[in-house]
Regions:
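Polar/charged low-complexity regulatory segments
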Residues: 2-207
Length: 207
């Protein structure tokens, strides 16, 4: 194990800073971002994006992947993803609008914004709540959400061809396998099994 890995695994656990479990609705909202990160350090059941406290990684990820280095840039990116995102180009080219791809990225970015202190916990929850109505209107199951996420990912990946970033994304097979694991009813750790699709349509409750 390298020095960087040792340092990460000696950081405090996220649940030591945020011990209160998410409510059913909160877990459902966080779970919209579950397709994005396949890393074992990613937290699936907290608003904080990692299983261990690592604000620096959240800040670096936003800067390197999204050129987000301030609250204003974060707000601008979230607004763009909520209004049009990648689905606008997908609709123009292919006639379909994969909202799930934009929604998953939106949630991931909002969580990292909270993780590095660009926005408060309250602001992060408000951001997540803002994306819920359009997602609920568009999809009726996690399966539908997953299918559209993968469609959106493919459109995004196709758009990278011929650019310097063409080799950056993980293989499509890796994304497919990750989504299958999230959808597997036998996977007890999947947040999609912990918070079924219709959770958000019922009164919120403690877990």
């Amino acid at each position: 194990m390298g020095l960087w890995s040792i340092r990460r695994w000696t950081k405090p656990r996220t649940k030591s800073r945020y011990p209160t479990p998410l409510t059913a609705h909160q877990l459902w909202m966080v779970s919209l971002g579950a397709p994005v990160s396949r890393d074992r350090t990613a937290s699936r059941t907290t608003l904080y994006p990692f299983t261990r406290i690592d604000d620096g990684s959240a800040r670096s990820w936003l800067a390197e992947q999204w050129e987000i280095t301030s609250r204003d840039r974060l707000a601008g990116r979230l607004d763009e993803l909520s209004r049009s995102g990648y689905r606008a180009r997908a609709h123009q080219l292919h006639g379909f609008s994969p909202l799930a791809w934009d929604a998953a990225l939106y949630v991931d970015i909002a969580r990292c914004g909270f993780g590095c202190g660009m926005i408060t916990e309250s602001e992060a929850w408000t951001a997540l709540k803002n994306i819920v109505p359009s997602v609920v209107r568009t999809y009726a199951s996690w399966q539908e959400y997953a299918d559209h996420y993968l469609l959106g990912r493919k459109v995004w990946q196709d758009g990278l061809r011929g650019t310097s970033d063409a080799s950056a994304p993980a293989p499509q097979a890796a994304a497919d396998a990750h989504l299958r694991a999230l959808l597997d009813p036998a996977n007890r750790s999947s947040p999609w099994n912990l918070a079924p699709w219709d959770t958000i349509s019922h009164p919120d409750r403690a877990r």
